[in-house]
């Protein structure tokens, strides 16, 4: 029914336009008999030369003689327009009455076509939303436009990254060198440099030299491989043997003399040397 309503409105608009064109092409001729008329009824019978504007402000219906033709044309145009609208409405009603089934069928076809096109329109809209410009790689752009550090040497490589700092390679190389080097000393104790321990060759006789050397190597191996066990063993010995040992007149756990220079030694080494001297 909505389609039929739209058809009726379109017919009304066409009829009104055609009626207006007919009125403009064929204006109605009014006989110039020297009288003023309105709607076919004679209001006043006065000559045009006598008619003029009333000076009384309360008389709102005064008519000037020069506007009679415009008033007649206006009334005739309104009458013709009303007649054209009446005819158009009558024709539309007749069409809707006689061809009502056809109008309903056409409106149903239009709605069906729209429903069939609706999924296609949704797909097109979804594709339009999915197609987006490729985002710019911010990290790559930052590397390309970064200002190089003149203090660091650079090496060009065939990767996406334009430059790689050479000091990174040097750092990895130095790390490998340290890992494959000898025994690393992570922590140090500071003892006076004048506190020197006697060498095993001077103290031990020839028969005990090899035994002491093997013991020293074993202690060093344990200190490298199992530092936690050595530390626990040393602390246990300190609890079982609380007596202080004297070396050259100084106590082992005495506070160091700050006036003497300090020499770094590995952890637990003073206790190892004290134990060895005690065994002798």
UniProtKB/Swiss-Prot annotation:
Location(s), subcellular: Secreted; Host nucleus
Motif (RxLR-dEER): 49-70
Entry keyword set: Host nucleus, Secreted, Signal, Virulence
Signal peptide: 1-19
Region (Disordered): 229-249
Example of a GO cellular component annotation carried by this entry: extracellular region
UniProt remark on domains: The RxLR-dEER motif acts to carry the protein into the host cell cytoplasm through binding to cell surface phosphatidylinositol-3-phosphate.
Protein family membership: Belongs to the RxLR effector family.
Role noted for this protein: Secreted effector that completely suppresses the host cell death induced by cell death-inducing proteins.
Name of the protein in question: Secreted RxLR effector protein 39
